[in-house]
Each structure stands twice: as C-alpha cells, then as structure tokens.
Amino acid sequence: DTIAMLGAAASGDLDVLVLLGSDPLSDVPDADLAERGLAGAGTVIAVEMLPNASTLAHADLVLPAAAPTEVDGTFTNLEGRVSVAEQKVTPPGTARADWMIAAELALRLGADLGVESPESIRAEIAAVSPVHAELTETALADGRVEGVLISGSSIEAPSVSASTTPANDSYSLRLVAARRMYDNGTMLQASASSAGLAASVKVTLNPADFEKLGLDAGTVVKVISGRGELMAPLAADFGVPAGSAMIPANAPGSNANTLIDASASVTDVRVERA
C-alpha cells in the first residue's frame, strides 16, 4: 500500500523507506504526499538503474541494480503468461540483481529472507501464488511454447464494494489523470531515441464544455484543485466525457499528480483563463 507507507513516513513513523525502481515524486498520484513521505522517512534507500527525481532529491543511499537483460528470471504479464528471461550481458560495475540486494538489505536489517537463487525465489512464488502453482523448474525447461509458459490457473477479479463519490459542483470538472505510452519516465528519458517522443502536457476537454467556459482550443488555462494548480493549453477531444478534464500524468512541463489528494475518492478542478 504505497499511499499508506508514504503517509506513515510523512508522520515520522517509518525509519527506513526502500525505493525499488520507484520514483514517487513523478509516479505517485499525490505529489504533495510523496514529497512529505520522502522528506519524513528516517532513511531513504534507492535500488535503481538510473537516477530520477526522487533519488536525486531524497536518497541517503543508492544501490545500483542490474537491468533485466543482465539477470536471470521470469516476467508475468496481466494474462498470467510467464516469460523466461535469461541473462544476456554482465552487469556493469557493482550493479547486482534486485533479489540479491533485497536479501542483503534484509540481513543488515536483522531478517533472513531465505533466498539464494532465482530458483529458490520461483519456488516461493509457486508456493504462495495460486496463479504460479504450476511454475516448476521442469515446466520452465520443458513446457515452453515459443518462449512462453501459460499458467493453468485462472485469475479471478477481486470483489470490490461500491463506493459513492461526491457530485460535481456546478462550476467544476472531474479530473481524469491519464497515462501515455511516452512520458517523463526515467528509462524513456534516458534513451535518446525515445526521450523526444513525450508530448508536452495539455488539458483536454469535450468540445461541449468549451462554450460553457468561454474558452477556445489552444488557450492557455490555469487548472486549480484543492491541492494545487498547473498551467497548460487547452485541447478538444470528443473521446473525453463531458464534464471531465483529462490531464496526462508525468508529462513534460506539468504533472497531474500536483492536483490530486490521494485520500479523496475523486478530484474536481476548476479551469480558468491564465
């Protein structure tokens, strides 16, 4: 529970916060909470391949992690398909696999995770995860289909109780924070071929809302919520529901997470001419 952990850190109740390939300042929906959490933690340890905003501003210790092509392991996608990843190159310098770093960190903090190899980790995953119950070393070695093993277990959607959200005010729009394929992500920006593909932030509304606001596409506006504000040009898209404002998360220039309070079920915003 990322929000709960950051809340505990912000309150001074978390002695050590470990960031495993994580950039809370950019990725957590509530930027204010992320900042307070990182600042309030006793010690921040980052396990990272590349520097990011959170590690540069708050990490007390950075442990270099190996890239996926530098370690052995498996990947599980949302369909339950398990792909085998084999080490292609040697990690540079002192970089190590995430599980090695986690095991040694645990020992330094007084706990033994009992893992010594990727095989021992897969055995534990198979023991605790029904989806991976058939994930044996034999299945991985003999049951590949074009490099992919499909788990025999089905994934059931968790039951979630319905919650009520407050109604829109007559002057407000409901914020939709959207993810794009290309953004300010650490690995994307570290690649010269993909760094320039992230589009700058725009506030996208349904054309039906433009007349109500007295604004036109291309107008630079200020978007205000109870948490913060940002400035960006307007854009029109019939795909955005009327009464909503779509703003990309972690886009160059501004981030929708500056507007969001993670403790609230929804975020309503006001849009006005800048």
Positions of predicted regions on the chain:
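Flexible, glycine/charged-enriched surface loops at secondary-structure junctions
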Residues: 113-120
